[in-house]
């Protein structure tokens, strides 16, 4: 655990029209650690990630990066700070190969010609650096990969750019047991390599398997951020479903009906 | 970042450098997995040529007829080359045929009615194509109308524009020497051989340099024998074609000599090389494939999706303009039916028969040339066998359906054998 957090959010508010999705959210993310962001469907996890990655502007709040106040107004701002996001729906092109996908939109060129050998080498080095051995050829189309391999490529793509913070939105949601284990191992390795990792997950087993800290969102409010070793399964579940657990979480009942997004009606509207 | 040491345990190094046998086994397994590429077009071409050669040995196999194939198929092939770009995005341009007619009518008006030099007319025709493409692309990308509807409207409207441009609905003749030469004259035999040599040497240089760079960096390369085979194959095919085209094909040599490579051939070849380079070797081309494969992923990767969508319509209509110029040259005139009747369907058919997918994300400019050859051979061979236009349309329609079925089935096959 290190002293200065890599990213610190304070007092983030975000509304979509009349619906306030994030309320006074605070979050600290440390390098070398996996911070699990948990919460029910519609709690605002994906929205928070999109605020961090510059897709949504925030209504209020501060961003501190390495202790310095920063403004993230666009995905490019986020990328230039070293923030990369692996989205819930993988942003890969089936008809392109692994190298082409990893460099999509940021191709290496010499003159106007694509520099394929350099891209292939860098891709290979990145995959080797993450000890990824599940893909046999860098030149195979992504359509021929399994779900786990695709997730692996998406993650490798995110770390290719000397990123400092990698955010993964439910990376294991669609995977089987073995592939989930592979991806979690990779997530752990990212943190062990010194990156700050934010992992969004519904799955308590995953969260407890890899995370160092757990941040719980409940109806758009950050109800607790604690070290994983200081909390139990049951307490996290209570935080997710009720917003409090014993001494943790909200002090009073938040259910002043009507002014917050309800988990039940927001599952379909959430960002997929 | 040049460590070959890292490469040793890198993922790609797991696969040993493929042998020739391995290379062909890879190819076969790709084909079986649904990635048939240009195979159907090549096989179709062989079958068709064999059939026609047996049925009409003297006329189909003559040097004169071989040269005819190129001038007959040129306009459709050029339009199809542009259509590939639109199809790569999973869009369609139904107006490409009549767009070529409009551009040809502009050409004829500028050169014949207004009396400007040929190159002004050519520029005007291509500029017209650019304007048409920009308009179509804007309507599709910025307003959000499906390309099917936009270009169907264009199909109707441009048909009217051609009628308006060709006054009285008769025709405008094109007599300019340069313009007439495009589809009616040939290169001298020596020039033909020189260009062939240049093409083969150029191809060999590119292939060998690429092989050497990759090998030097420790990346997987195709076996050198396969590279040599490719170069040799190109040399043999081009050499044979040029040899036949350089044979005397005049009925009476004393009156006039007729031999050499038709001028449209180097025109198509140069455009093929340029567009292939753009698609395969530039990031613009890469982004076209990306938008065709997964538009949302492309957008998140920071690619200007709208810009790409507009640009492919511009390329398509500009290529249609060039097709229109060739058609006007071949007919020595422009009439209200230039670019009409079967031209569009032949062009779409050419691209699809060549292996470009109607679902987007898959295709090459070469597909248009191979498919264009198939269409030209059908048209030509059936004409020689004395079939009526009616039968030709039906057969071409069936071939287009066949090609579209191959496309759809290979997609399903890919979905079944791959994990998606
Ligand atoms: N672009 C948007 N416009 C309006 N409401 C949105 C938008 N994105 C998300 N929301 C709403 O914000 C709430 C939180 O959604 P989301 O962040 O996707 O939750 P989670 O990822 O935690 O499941 C939901 O009520 C959802 O309907
Ligand atoms: Mg979500």
Task: Write out the residue ranges for each language-model feature.
Chain A
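Glycine-rich phosphate-binding loops of nucleotide-dependent enzymes
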Residues: 2-272
């Amino acid at each position: 655990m290190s002293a200065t957090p890599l990213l610190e959010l304070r007092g983030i508010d975000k509304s979509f029209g009349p619906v306030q999705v994030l309320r006074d959210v605070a979050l600290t993310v440390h390098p070398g650690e996996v911070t699990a962001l948990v919460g029910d469907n519609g709690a605002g996890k994906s929205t928070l990630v999109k605020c961090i990655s510059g897709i949504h502007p925030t209504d209020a709040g501060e961003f501190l990066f390495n202790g310095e106040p920063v403004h993230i107004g666009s995905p490019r701002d986020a990328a230039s700070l070293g923030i990369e996001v692996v989205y819930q729906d993988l942003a890969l092109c089936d008809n392109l190969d692994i190298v082409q996908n990893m460099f999509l939109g940021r191709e290496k060129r010499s003159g106007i010609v694509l520099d394929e050998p350099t891209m292939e080498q860098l891709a290979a080095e990145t995959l080797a650096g993450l000890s990824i051995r599940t893909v046999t050829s860098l030149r195979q189309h992504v359509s021929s990969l399994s779900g786990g391999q695709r997730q692996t490529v998406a993650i490798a793509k995110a770390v290719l750019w000397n990123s400092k913070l990698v955010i993964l939105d439910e990376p294991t949601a669609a995977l089987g047991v073995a592939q989930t284990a592979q991806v979690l191992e990779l997530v752990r390795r990212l943190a062990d390599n010194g990156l700050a990792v934010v992992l969004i997950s519904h799955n308590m087993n995953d969260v407890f398997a890899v995370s160092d800290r757990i941040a719980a969102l409940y109806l758009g409010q950050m109800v607790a951020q604690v070290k994983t070793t200081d909390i139990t399964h049951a307490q996290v579940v209570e935080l997710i479903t009720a917003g409090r657990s014993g001494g943790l979480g909200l002090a009073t009942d938040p259910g002043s009906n009507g002014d917050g997004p309800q988990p039940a009606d927001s599952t379909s509207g959430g960002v997929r | 970042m040049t460590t070959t040491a890292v490469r040793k345990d890198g993922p790609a190094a797991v696969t040993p450098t493929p042998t020739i046998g391995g290379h062909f086994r890879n190819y076969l397994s790709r084909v079986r997995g649904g990635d048939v590429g240009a195979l159907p077009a090549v096989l179709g071409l062989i079958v068709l040529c064999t059939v026609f050669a047996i049925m009409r040995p003297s006329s189909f196999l003559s040097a004169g007829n071989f040269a005819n194939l190129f001038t007959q198929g040129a306009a459709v092939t050029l339009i199809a080359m542009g259509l590939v770009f639109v199809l790569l995005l999973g869009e369609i341009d139904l107006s490409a045929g009549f767009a070529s007619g409009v551009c040809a009518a502009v050409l004829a008006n500028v050169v014949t009615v207004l009396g400007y030099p040929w190159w002004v007319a050519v520029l005007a025709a291509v500029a017209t194509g650019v304007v048409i493409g920009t308009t179509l692309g804007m309507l599709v990308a910025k307003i959000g109308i499906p390309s099917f509807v936009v270009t169907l409207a264009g199909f109707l409207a441009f048909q009217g524009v051609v009628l308006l441009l060709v006054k009285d609905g008769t025709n405008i003749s094109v007599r300019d020497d340069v313009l007439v030469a495009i589809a009616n004259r040939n290169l001298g035999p020596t020039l033909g051989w020189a260009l062939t040599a240049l093409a083969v040497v150029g191809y060999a240089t590119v292939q060998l340099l690429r092989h050497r760079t990759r090998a030097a960096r420790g990346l997987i390369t195709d076996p050198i024998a396969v590279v040599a085979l490719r170069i040799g194959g190109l040399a043999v095919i081009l050499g044979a074609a040029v040899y036949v085209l350089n044979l005397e094909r005049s009925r009476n040599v004393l009156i006039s000599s007729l031999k050499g490579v038709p001028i449209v051939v180097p025109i198509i070849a140069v455009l093929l090389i340029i567009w292939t380079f753009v698609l395969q070797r530039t990031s613009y081309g890469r982004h076209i494939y990306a938008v065709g494969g997964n538009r949302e992923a492309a957008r998140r990767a920071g690619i200007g999706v709208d810009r790409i969508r507009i640009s492919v319509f511009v390329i398509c209509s500009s290529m249609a303009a060039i097709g229109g110029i060739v058609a006007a040259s071949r007919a020595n005139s422009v009439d209200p039916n230039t670019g009409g009747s079967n031209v569009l369907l032949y062009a779409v058919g050419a691209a699809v028969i060549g292996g470009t997918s109607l679902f987007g994300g898959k295709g090459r400019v070469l597909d248009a040339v191979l498919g264009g050859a198939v269409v030209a051979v059908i048209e030509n061979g059936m004409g020689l066998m004395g079939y009526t236009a009616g039968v030709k349309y039906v057969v071409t329609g069936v071939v287009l359906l066949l090609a579209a079925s191959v496309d759809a089935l290979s997609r399903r096959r890919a979905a079944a054998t791959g994990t998606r």
